[in-house]
Design a protein with these regions (language model features):
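An amphipathic, aromatic/His-enriched active-site/gating alpha helix that lines ligand/cofactor pockets
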Residues: 23-40, 58-95
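Short, surface-exposed ligand-recognition loops at beta-strand->loop->(often short) alpha-helix junctions
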Residues: 9-22
């Protein structure tokens, strides 16, 4: 299992909109759910640094993740454009081998169909 990890530095006043875009019911997660390889995500807000967020997406296979990005490239670019208006900086932290992941029913775990 892969974990794709991003860090975002969100502009003051854009936090609510950013959280709606990337939250469990947001457009970014909805697009990811269209792939059977998408297993869920964790969306974290830094308590010590205002406006800093981490997004961890869990995918079953790298090839399917890459195919998903290619198949939905127009939609991905549209969402990235929306996000760019809200963030000062986007840092791709990397793609990791997920050794320990949250239970599928934990509060931060988003799954298909909202379950």
């Amino acid at each position: 299992m892969l974990a794709v990890v991003w860090q975002f530095d969100v502009q003051d006043g854009s936090e609510d909109e950013f959280e709606r875009l990337h939250g469990a019911d947001g457009a970014w997660t909805a697009l990811s759910r269209r792939s059977r390889s998408f297993l869920g995500s964790s969306f974290l807000k830094d308590l010590a640094t205002p406006g800093r967020y981490l997004l961890l997406e869990y995918w079953s296979e790298m090839m399917v993740y890459e195919k998903h990005l290619a198949d939905f490239s127009d939609h991905v670019e549209e969402l990235k454009s929306q996000r760019a208006a809200m963030v000062r900086e986007t840092l791709p932290l990397g793609i990791f081998d997920a050794l320990d992941v949250p239970e599928r029913h934990s509060p931060t775990w988003s799954v298909r169909d909202g379950r």
